[in-house]
Protein backbone atom coordinates (compact mmCIF):
# COMPACT_ATOMS: atom_id res chain seq x y z
CA UNK A 1 0.00 0.00 0.00
CA UNK A 2 2.81 2.40 0.97
CA UNK A 3 4.76 1.56 -2.22
CA UNK A 4 1.68 2.24 -4.36
CA UNK A 5 1.18 5.58 -2.63
CA UNK A 6 4.83 6.56 -3.23
CA UNK A 7 4.63 5.62 -6.92
CA UNK A 8 1.40 7.59 -7.19
CA UNK A 9 2.98 10.69 -5.66
CA UNK A 10 5.96 10.50 -8.04
CA UNK A 11 3.65 10.13 -11.05
CA UNK A 12 1.47 13.00 -9.84
CA UNK A 13 4.56 15.19 -9.43
CA UNK A 14 5.82 14.31 -12.94
CA UNK A 15 2.41 14.96 -14.53
CA UNK A 16 2.06 18.33 -12.79
CA UNK A 17 5.62 19.47 -13.52
CA UNK A 18 5.66 22.56 -15.70
CA UNK A 19 8.34 23.47 -18.21
CA UNK A 20 8.11 27.19 -18.93
CA UNK A 21 10.97 27.32 -21.41
CA UNK A 22 13.24 24.79 -23.09
CA UNK A 23 15.86 25.30 -25.81
CA UNK A 24 18.47 22.99 -27.32
CA UNK A 25 19.15 24.91 -30.58
CA UNK A 26 18.57 21.74 -32.62
CA UNK A 27 16.51 23.30 -35.44
CA UNK A 28 16.88 26.16 -37.91
CA UNK A 29 14.08 28.23 -36.35
CA UNK A 30 16.14 29.39 -33.37
CA UNK A 31 16.40 32.91 -34.83
CA UNK A 32 12.60 33.17 -34.74
CA UNK A 33 12.63 32.41 -31.02
CA UNK A 34 15.72 34.37 -30.03
CA UNK A 35 15.78 38.14 -30.47
CA UNK A 36 19.09 39.94 -30.99
CA UNK A 37 19.32 43.33 -29.33
CA UNK A 38 19.69 46.40 -31.55
CA UNK A 39 20.56 48.69 -28.66
CA UNK A 40 24.12 49.00 -30.03
CA UNK A 41 25.35 48.62 -33.60
CA UNK A 42 28.52 46.84 -32.56
CA UNK A 43 27.09 44.04 -30.41
CA UNK A 44 28.89 40.72 -30.97
CA UNK A 45 27.46 38.26 -33.49
CA UNK A 46 26.10 34.82 -32.64
CA UNK A 47 26.11 31.57 -34.60
CA UNK A 48 25.00 27.98 -34.08
CA UNK A 49 27.92 25.58 -33.66
CA UNK A 50 28.90 22.33 -31.96
CA UNK A 51 32.45 23.61 -31.61
CA UNK A 52 35.78 21.99 -32.33
CA UNK A 53 35.08 18.92 -30.20
CA UNK A 54 31.73 17.43 -29.19
CA UNK A 55 29.79 14.30 -28.32
CA UNK A 56 27.03 14.48 -30.95
CA UNK A 57 27.30 16.71 -34.03
CA UNK A 58 23.57 17.53 -34.00
CA UNK A 59 22.57 17.43 -30.32
CA UNK A 60 25.59 19.44 -29.21
CA UNK A 61 24.86 22.45 -31.39
CA UNK A 62 24.50 25.57 -29.29
CA UNK A 63 24.59 29.36 -29.35
CA UNK A 64 28.18 30.53 -29.87
CA UNK A 65 29.88 33.91 -29.44
CA UNK A 66 32.05 34.70 -32.48
CA UNK A 67 33.82 38.06 -32.07
CA UNK A 68 36.51 39.02 -29.57
CA UNK A 69 36.23 42.03 -27.25
CA UNK A 70 32.48 42.49 -27.74
CA UNK A 71 29.31 42.95 -25.72
CA UNK A 72 26.60 40.39 -26.51
CA UNK A 73 22.86 40.63 -25.95
CA UNK A 74 20.21 38.16 -27.06
CA UNK A 75 17.03 36.84 -25.46
CA UNK A 76 13.85 34.81 -25.85
CA UNK A 77 10.30 35.28 -24.57
CA UNK A 78 8.34 32.46 -22.93
CA UNK A 79 5.06 31.32 -24.50
CA UNK A 80 3.36 32.39 -21.28
CA UNK A 81 4.63 34.32 -18.26
CA UNK A 82 4.30 32.78 -14.80
CA UNK A 83 4.78 33.32 -11.08
CA UNK A 84 6.90 30.98 -9.00
CA UNK A 85 4.87 31.63 -5.84
CA UNK A 86 4.30 28.43 -3.89
CA UNK A 87 6.63 26.28 -6.01
CA UNK A 88 10.24 25.71 -6.94
CA UNK A 89 12.01 27.62 -9.69
CA UNK A 90 14.75 25.79 -11.60
CA UNK A 91 17.07 27.53 -14.09
CA UNK A 92 19.54 25.33 -15.92
CA UNK A 93 21.84 25.66 -18.94
CA UNK A 94 25.20 24.44 -20.22
CA UNK A 95 28.35 26.45 -20.94
CA UNK A 96 31.44 25.43 -22.92
CA UNK A 97 34.44 27.79 -22.93
CA UNK A 98 36.32 25.80 -25.57
CA UNK A 99 38.39 28.91 -26.43
CA UNK A 100 40.02 28.62 -22.98
CA UNK A 101 38.46 31.93 -22.00
CA UNK A 102 40.64 34.52 -20.27
CA UNK A 103 37.96 37.09 -19.44
CA UNK A 104 34.23 36.98 -20.08
CA UNK A 105 30.79 36.16 -18.77
CA UNK A 106 28.83 32.94 -19.19
CA UNK A 107 25.61 33.70 -17.33
CA UNK A 108 21.89 34.04 -18.09
CA UNK A 109 19.36 36.61 -16.94
CA UNK A 110 15.73 35.82 -16.10
CA UNK A 111 13.47 38.78 -16.88
CA UNK A 112 9.87 40.01 -16.80
CA UNK A 113 7.51 39.42 -19.73
CA UNK A 114 7.37 43.10 -20.70
CA UNK A 115 11.12 43.39 -21.38
CA UNK A 116 12.00 44.87 -24.78
CA UNK A 117 14.55 42.34 -26.03
CA UNK A 118 15.30 44.39 -29.16
CA UNK A 119 16.61 47.14 -26.87
CA UNK A 120 18.12 45.02 -24.09
CA UNK A 121 21.56 45.89 -22.71
CA UNK A 122 23.64 45.75 -19.54
CA UNK A 123 21.34 48.09 -17.61
CA UNK A 124 18.10 46.33 -18.56
CA UNK A 125 16.27 45.23 -15.36
CA UNK A 126 16.23 41.52 -14.56
CA UNK A 127 14.93 39.22 -11.82
CA UNK A 128 17.83 36.76 -11.52
CA UNK A 129 21.32 36.60 -12.98
CA UNK A 130 22.98 33.19 -12.74
CA UNK A 131 26.07 31.53 -14.16
CA UNK A 132 29.87 31.53 -14.40
CA UNK A 133 32.10 34.57 -14.77
CA UNK A 134 35.84 34.38 -15.46
CA UNK A 135 38.41 37.17 -15.67
CA UNK A 136 42.06 36.34 -15.10
CA UNK A 137 43.22 34.19 -12.18
CA UNK A 138 41.35 36.32 -9.63
CA UNK A 139 37.75 35.92 -10.85
CA UNK A 140 36.41 32.41 -11.42
CA UNK A 141 33.02 32.40 -9.76
CA UNK A 142 29.36 31.58 -10.19
CA UNK A 143 27.12 34.65 -9.99
CA UNK A 144 23.78 34.33 -8.21
CA UNK A 145 22.17 37.77 -8.16
CA UNK A 146 18.56 38.45 -7.15
CA UNK A 147 16.66 41.67 -7.76
CA UNK A 148 14.72 42.67 -4.64
CA UNK A 149 13.13 46.02 -3.79
CA UNK A 150 14.87 48.03 -6.52
CA UNK A 151 18.32 46.59 -5.85
CA UNK A 152 20.45 43.77 -7.25
CA UNK A 153 21.78 41.62 -4.41
CA UNK A 154 24.90 39.46 -4.90
CA UNK A 155 25.42 36.23 -3.01
CA UNK A 156 27.76 36.60 -0.04
CA UNK A 157 29.37 33.19 -0.60
CA UNK A 158 32.12 32.46 -3.12
CA UNK A 159 31.12 29.67 -5.53
CA UNK A 160 33.96 28.65 -7.83
CA UNK A 161 33.06 27.89 -11.44
CA UNK A 162 34.72 25.44 -13.83
CA UNK A 163 37.50 26.98 -15.93
CA UNK A 164 38.42 24.24 -18.41
CA UNK A 165 37.46 23.89 -22.10
CA UNK A 166 34.66 21.34 -21.67
CA UNK A 167 30.87 21.69 -21.36
CA UNK A 168 29.49 22.15 -17.85
CA UNK A 169 25.91 22.17 -16.59
CA UNK A 170 24.86 24.96 -14.21
CA UNK A 171 21.64 24.61 -12.18
CA UNK A 172 19.97 27.05 -9.79
CA UNK A 173 17.10 25.78 -7.63
CA UNK A 174 15.06 28.36 -5.69
CA UNK A 175 12.56 26.78 -3.31
CA UNK A 176 9.31 28.14 -1.86
CA UNK A 177 10.68 27.82 1.69
CA UNK A 178 13.26 30.52 0.88
CA UNK A 179 16.12 28.06 0.43
CA UNK A 180 18.30 27.54 -2.63
CA UNK A 181 20.83 25.17 -4.17
CA UNK A 182 23.46 25.67 -6.87
CA UNK A 183 24.59 22.60 -8.79
CA UNK A 184 27.46 22.17 -11.23
CA UNK A 185 27.30 19.07 -13.41
CA UNK A 186 24.50 17.68 -11.25
CA UNK A 187 26.50 17.93 -8.02
CA UNK A 188 25.73 20.36 -5.21
CA UNK A 189 28.18 23.27 -5.19
CA UNK A 190 26.40 25.43 -2.59
CA UNK A 191 23.11 25.71 -0.72
CA UNK A 192 21.52 27.62 2.11
CA UNK A 193 18.88 30.17 3.04
CA UNK A 194 18.11 33.24 0.95
CA UNK A 195 17.94 35.56 3.95
CA UNK A 196 21.28 34.34 5.33
CA UNK A 197 23.28 34.41 2.09
CA UNK A 198 21.99 37.68 0.59
CA UNK A 199 21.49 41.12 2.16
CA UNK A 200 17.81 41.33 1.26
CA UNK A 201 16.71 42.47 4.72
CA UNK A 202 18.24 44.59 7.46
CA UNK A 203 19.83 42.51 10.24
CA UNK A 204 17.58 41.21 13.00
CA UNK A 205 19.94 42.56 15.63
CA UNK A 206 22.58 45.27 15.86
CA UNK A 207 25.24 46.12 18.44
CA UNK A 208 23.79 48.13 21.31
CA UNK A 209 25.10 51.68 20.73
CA UNK A 210 24.78 52.45 24.46
CA UNK A 211 26.86 49.47 25.57
CA UNK A 212 30.52 50.18 26.35
CA UNK A 213 33.30 47.86 27.40
CA UNK A 214 34.07 48.44 31.13
CA UNK A 215 37.36 50.26 31.68
CA UNK A 216 38.62 47.51 33.99
CA UNK A 217 37.79 44.72 31.53
CA UNK A 218 41.05 42.87 30.88
CA UNK A 219 41.20 40.80 27.66
CA UNK A 220 44.84 39.76 28.13
CA UNK A 221 44.96 36.03 28.80
CA UNK A 222 48.71 36.11 29.57
CA UNK A 223 50.90 38.85 31.05
CA UNK A 224 54.62 39.37 31.75
CA UNK A 225 55.96 37.60 34.82
CA UNK A 226 57.27 40.48 36.95
CA UNK A 227 59.51 38.07 38.92
CA UNK A 228 61.41 37.05 35.80
CA UNK A 229 64.66 39.02 35.43
CA UNK A 230 67.01 39.37 32.48
CA UNK A 231 70.32 37.50 33.04
CA UNK A 232 73.34 39.77 33.43
CA UNK A 233 75.21 38.11 30.54
CA UNK A 234 72.24 38.29 28.15
CA UNK A 235 73.22 41.34 26.07
CA UNK A 236 75.67 40.23 23.40
CA UNK A 237 76.14 41.81 19.95
CA UNK A 238 74.47 40.05 17.01
CA UNK A 239 77.66 40.23 14.90
CA UNK A 240 81.34 40.14 15.90
CA UNK A 241 84.64 40.45 13.96
CA UNK A 242 85.68 37.12 12.46
CA UNK A 243 88.40 35.85 14.87
CA UNK A 244 89.91 33.68 12.11
CA UNK A 245 90.22 36.49 9.59
CA UNK A 246 93.76 37.70 8.75
CA UNK A 247 94.78 40.93 7.11
CA UNK A 248 96.01 40.20 3.55
CA UNK A 249 99.78 40.47 3.15
CA UNK A 250 99.41 42.92 0.26
CA UNK A 251 97.14 45.21 2.28
CA UNK A 252 98.48 48.80 2.30
CA UNK A 253 96.96 50.87 5.14
CA UNK A 254 97.96 54.13 3.44
CA UNK A 255 96.44 53.11 0.11
CA UNK A 256 93.59 50.84 1.26
CA UNK A 257 92.72 52.41 4.61
CA UNK A 258 92.69 50.74 7.99
CA UNK A 259 91.94 47.02 7.63
CA UNK A 260 88.88 45.72 9.45
CA UNK A 261 88.06 42.04 9.73
CA UNK A 262 84.73 40.90 8.24
CA UNK A 263 81.81 40.42 10.64
CA UNK A 264 80.30 37.02 11.43
CA UNK A 265 77.26 35.88 13.43
CA UNK A 266 77.89 35.82 17.14
CA UNK A 267 77.18 32.32 18.53
CA UNK A 268 76.50 33.88 21.96
CA UNK A 269 73.86 36.28 20.64
CA UNK A 270 70.45 35.54 22.19
CA UNK A 271 68.27 38.20 20.63
CA UNK A 272 65.88 40.52 22.41
CA UNK A 273 65.12 39.42 25.95
CA UNK A 274 61.48 39.06 26.87
CA UNK A 275 60.12 38.09 30.28
CA UNK A 276 58.28 34.82 30.66
CA UNK A 277 54.50 34.88 30.39
CA UNK A 278 52.09 33.82 33.09
CA UNK A 279 48.31 33.47 33.38
CA UNK A 280 46.61 36.78 33.98
CA UNK A 281 44.54 36.52 37.19
CA UNK A 282 42.42 39.49 36.04
CA UNK A 283 41.61 37.92 32.64
CA UNK A 284 37.88 38.10 31.84
CA UNK A 285 37.87 36.79 28.29
CA UNK A 286 37.04 38.65 25.09
CA UNK A 287 34.35 41.26 25.67
CA UNK A 288 31.29 40.61 23.50
CA UNK A 289 29.31 43.63 22.48
CA UNK A 290 25.65 43.14 23.51
CA UNK A 291 23.10 43.21 20.69
CA UNK A 292 19.58 44.60 20.55
CA UNK A 293 16.71 43.80 18.21
CA UNK A 294 15.94 46.54 15.73
CA UNK A 295 12.36 47.70 15.13
CA UNK A 296 12.91 48.06 11.36
CA UNK A 297 13.34 44.32 10.84
CA UNK A 298 10.38 42.63 9.16
CA UNK A 299 10.67 39.05 7.89
CA UNK A 300 9.59 38.31 4.33
CA UNK A 301 8.28 34.84 3.52
CA UNK A 302 8.16 35.78 -0.18
CA UNK A 303 11.83 36.57 -0.77
CA UNK A 304 11.89 33.88 -3.46
CA UNK A 305 8.80 35.13 -5.35
CA UNK A 306 8.74 36.78 -8.77
CA UNK A 307 5.20 37.42 -9.99
CA UNK A 308 6.01 37.94 -13.67
CA UNK A 309 8.70 35.72 -15.20
CA UNK A 310 8.54 35.77 -18.97
CA UNK A 311 11.94 35.96 -20.68
CA UNK A 312 15.52 34.74 -20.53
CA UNK A 313 18.63 36.13 -22.14
CA UNK A 314 22.39 36.27 -22.43
CA UNK A 315 23.78 39.74 -21.78
CA UNK A 316 27.54 39.64 -21.36
CA UNK A 317 31.02 40.84 -22.31
CA UNK A 318 33.78 38.59 -23.66
CA UNK A 319 37.41 39.42 -24.40
CA UNK A 320 37.99 36.07 -26.14
CA UNK A 321 34.94 34.70 -27.96
CA UNK A 322 34.00 31.09 -28.64
CA UNK A 323 31.72 30.18 -25.73
CA UNK A 324 28.84 27.82 -26.59
CA UNK A 325 25.55 27.93 -24.61
CA UNK A 326 23.08 25.06 -24.86
CA UNK A 327 20.31 23.06 -23.17
CA UNK A 328 18.48 25.94 -21.51
CA UNK A 329 15.49 25.01 -19.34
CA UNK A 330 13.27 26.90 -16.90
CA UNK A 331 10.88 24.69 -14.93
CA UNK A 332 9.36 24.07 -11.52
CA UNK A 333 10.67 20.49 -11.46
CA UNK A 334 14.16 19.45 -10.39
CA UNK A 335 13.53 16.03 -11.97
CA UNK A 336 12.62 17.53 -15.36
CA UNK A 337 15.78 19.64 -15.32
CA UNK A 338 17.82 16.60 -14.34
CA UNK A 339 16.40 14.54 -17.23
CA UNK A 340 17.03 17.35 -19.69
CA UNK A 341 20.61 17.72 -18.47
CA UNK A 342 21.49 14.02 -18.70
CA UNK A 343 22.46 14.40 -22.36
CA UNK A 344 25.04 17.00 -21.39
CA UNK A 345 26.46 14.95 -18.55
CA UNK A 346 26.70 11.72 -20.56
CA UNK A 347 26.86 11.97 -24.37
CA UNK A 348 28.33 15.47 -24.61
CA UNK A 349 30.95 15.26 -21.87
CA UNK A 350 32.20 11.78 -22.82
CA UNK A 351 32.54 12.68 -26.50
CA UNK A 352 34.21 15.99 -25.74
CA UNK A 353 36.84 14.43 -23.53
CA UNK A 354 37.83 11.94 -26.23
CA UNK A 355 38.06 14.57 -28.95
CA UNK A 356 39.30 17.21 -26.55
CA UNK A 357 42.38 15.14 -25.76
CA UNK A 358 43.18 15.04 -29.45
CA UNK A 359 42.73 18.79 -29.62
CA UNK A 360 45.13 19.29 -26.72
CA UNK A 361 47.73 17.19 -28.53
CA UNK A 362 47.25 19.28 -31.63
CA UNK A 363 47.71 22.45 -29.58
CA UNK A 364 50.91 21.07 -28.08
CA UNK A 365 52.16 20.13 -31.54
CA UNK A 366 51.34 23.60 -32.87
CA UNK A 367 53.14 25.18 -29.91
CA UNK A 368 56.26 23.08 -30.53
CA UNK A 369 56.22 23.94 -34.23
CA UNK A 370 55.94 27.63 -33.36
CA UNK A 371 58.96 27.35 -31.03
CA UNK A 372 60.95 25.64 -33.80
CA UNK A 373 60.08 28.41 -36.26
CA UNK A 374 61.17 31.07 -33.78
CA UNK A 375 64.49 29.29 -33.26
CA UNK A 376 65.02 29.08 -37.04
CA UNK A 377 64.36 32.82 -37.36
CA UNK A 378 66.91 33.60 -34.64
CA UNK A 379 69.54 31.43 -36.35
CA UNK A 380 68.95 33.17 -39.68
CA UNK A 381 69.32 36.58 -38.03
CA UNK A 382 72.54 35.47 -36.33
CA UNK A 383 73.96 34.18 -39.64
CA UNK A 384 73.15 37.47 -41.37
CA UNK A 385 75.01 39.42 -38.69
CA UNK A 386 78.07 37.15 -39.07
CA UNK A 387 78.14 37.73 -42.84
CA UNK A 388 78.02 41.50 -42.31
Swiss-Prot record:
Extract the GO molecular function terms from the UniProt entry.
calcium ion binding; carbohydrate binding; unfolded protein binding
SS bond list: 103-135
**Where are the residues of the annotated region 4 X approximate repeats?**
189-253
Q: Where do the annotations place an alpha-D-glucoside binding?
A: 107, 109, 126, 133, 315
Q: Where is the composition biased (Basic and acidic residues)?
A: 205-215, 228-249
Q: Where does the record say this protein resides? A: Endoplasmic reticulum lumen
Q: One Gene Ontology cellular component annotation?
A: endoplasmic reticulum lumen
> What SUPFAM superfamilies does this protein map onto?
Concanavalin A-like lectins/glucanases, P-domain of calnexin/calreticulin
**Ranges of Basic residues composition bias in the record:** 354-365, 373-388
> Which residues constitute the signal peptide according to the record?
1-17
Q: What is its main location?
A: endoplasmic reticulum
One short Pfam name that applies is Calreticulin
Q: Which keywords does this Swiss-Prot/TrEMBL entry list?
A: Calcium, Chaperone, Disulfide bond, Endoplasmic reticulum, Lectin, Metal-binding, Repeat, Signal, Zinc
For bias type Acidic residues, the affected ranges are 216-227, 250-259
The record's family statement is: Belongs to the calreticulin family.
Instruction: State the protein's purpose.
Output: Molecular calcium-binding chaperone promoting folding, oligomeric assembly and quality control in the ER via the calreticulin/calnexin cycle. This lectin may interact transiently with almost all of the monoglucosylated glycoproteins that are synthesized in the ER.
Q: Which PANTHER family match?
A: CALRETICULIN, CALRETICULIN AND CALNEXIN
Q: What is this protein called?
A: Calreticulin
Species the sequence originates in: Onchocerca volvulus
